[in-house]
Amino acid sequence: MKLTSMIPPQVNLANGCFTAPDVQRKSTTLGSLAGIFADPVAWQSLPAELAVYQVEMLPSVQQEGELFVGTTHLQPGRVGDEFFMTRGHFHQRPEQAEFYFGLRGQGLLLLQHQDGACTLEQVSPGSVHHIPSFTAHRLINTGNDVLSALAVWPTVAGHNYDALQPQGFKLRVFADGDDWKAEAQYE
């Protein structure tokens, strides 16, 4: 029997960056987040090409039992008084759960169950977050540095952005002096 040795992909746990030949990367700009922020005038006043967050992930086979691993890097910033955030989503297969691991920065994970119940969890280096099935999720950067979170989720989960329309998430997070405050947008 011939034994082979390989160097697997690496992740820097201080910043969430992957080292591998086939890392997939995607950047989401402010211009692609139309309708996400509460203040459309403030949103339009900022450069459309401004990168709000980047996702890098390792490729994986998309079939039952397989997992993706990736990192979201959410930039610090605001649109008006509202902190930068990811688009957020339910899973296309809503019974699929996910884990987030805080790596750097300070922020929040907004969880909204399909029944409308919301929870905000503080994200920081070392924090561990279970995103239950049937739960939409969004990262919010309340700090002054990049917020990075490593995620592990089933390759069959998919993303369902339309399930939150037309109202979006129930909660929004705004700056409140040096802190933050959450405001309900609807009942």
Locations of the language-model features?
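N-terminal capping/interface segment
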Residues: 1-14
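Weak global preference for isoleucine
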Residues: 7, 36, 128-131, 140
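Active-site region of the double-stranded beta-helix
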Residues: 17-122, 142-147, 152-187
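Histidine-centered metal-chelating micro-motifs
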Residues: 108, 128-129, 133-138, 158
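Charged, surface-exposed interaction regions in soluble eukaryotic proteins
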Residues: 121-125, 129
